[in-house]
Amino acid sequence: MAAALALALGLALLPSPGRRSGYTVEWFQQEAADVPDQAFIRIYTKAALPVAVKQQTAESTPVWEYNLFIREENGVGVTVSELTCVRFYKSGKTDIYASTVDVFGERNGGRPSYIGGREMRRLSCGRTADRQSIGEGWMLRGTDDHGNPVCFTTYIPFERYRN
């Protein structure tokens, strides 16, 4: 009962994707509760943090590159309603990118994406490095196979670009 109340309160306090200032780095860094018999998705990277700036040659564009892993750990699948990436800038501004269908590039005809129990997905992320960006927050929302609304987040900090 307490876990369900905490989840309901947490979902009620989610930032609105339409509000530009609703997301914070701290919000993306919060750990989600691992509730028994409910989907639990871990979103992470194996890259050293902060993600380093890479530049192949002096003439090439500097980038931040990392793989984002999304793994369900409780054996309960999730129908994904939204995968959102928020890029944070030193100025406090954000850019918000959200996908609601085919979020993993499955080309499934516009139907919602699905992550099965104990399944892992990987996204390759490459961003042009600049002096203003400080990192990206990732959020996955959906409904698990038991009808529970779920939301999971992570924050990926970027190495400071000094060119």
Where are these regions (language model features)?
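Bacterial Sec-dependent signal peptides at the C-terminal "C-region" and cleavage site
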Residues: 9-24
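A eukaryote-biased signal for short, well-structured alpha-helical docking elements
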Residues: 20-38
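Short, solvent-exposed loop/turn segments enriched in Ser/Thr/Gly
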Residues: 47, 58-67, 135-136
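Asparagine-centered strand-capping/turn motif at beta-strand->loop junctions
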Residues: 70-74
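Short, hydrophobic/aromatic beta-strand segments
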Residues: 76-84
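Surface-exposed binding patches on compact interaction domains or structured appendages
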Residues: 89-111
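Short, solvent-exposed, Trp/other aromatic-anchored flexible loops in extracytoplasmic proteins
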Residues: 103-139, 144
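Short beta-strand elements
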Residues: 150-163
